[in-house]
Amino acid sequence: LRHFPQGDRRNYVEGSWSGFEYDFSNSVFFYPVDMKDSWYQNSVDFSGCTYYASAEFSGSTYERSAYFCDSTYYDWVFFNNSTYCGEAQWSGSTYHDSARFNWSVYYGEVSFHDSVYGGSVFFDQSLYYDEALFYSSTYRGEAGFDGSLYRGSVFVNDSVFEDEVSLYGSIFCDALNFGTDFFGESYPSRFVQSAPCFVAEKNARATLFGSSSNNFVVENSGYSIALGAKGLPLGCGFLSTGQADYIAAKFREVYEARTYLRDSQVPQERQDLREKLESLSQNIRAWRKEATALPGGN
């Protein structure tokens, strides 16, 4: 476990416990938890935990797998501005208050499925380099997926959204599924209050897609998703050839840097690779923002 002084990721302090695996599974926290600005070299397990007070995990880096699944949060919980180098799991969890996962980077598969969000939840401004699983969940408050980039398939099927949902300004490079599971079976989601927002005129942002294999079929008992001639939500479009080629090249750079980082045992080389990955993520975020901007600002 390492700690970043004042949240500065470039100047972490490595301690004698840096190389350990941490297992907090099935713990009960009756007091506020402050784990922000931490760096875990090996896997960490917070699965099955119960938090009766607030929990703060923001600004952290997980070099291996991170497990937060099957947990219960009675107060707010923040995972903002964090980096997950391996698999990350929050599936099967219950949030009684607000939850925040903004400005994060996920290099491995990420699982939020089979969860209940009692308050608002935001996954905004994040990068997903593998599959993202949000299916079979209940969202009782506002849910935000906007301003993000998803490289792999995204499954949001078999879910209930009781409040507003926003996805504007995001890019889905692979399929976005609201109506089917992994095997193509029909499990449509339901939007109780309003249709999801893919275009925000006030923010001058639309949503772009890289695949034509999306599924926007939702339950008839709720609001439907209006589609245009291209089979995409109204006001949305596909990535151009140039845009698709650009982001594919960036993905290759990320993959190569991640591979070298995984295999390297040289401290300075590892630090250089981490800085390269951070720079690539910043470039991709800036490109995503420019690509999803509406012409003329409206």
Predicted feature locations:
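N-terminal leader/targeting and pre-domain segments
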Residues: 1-298
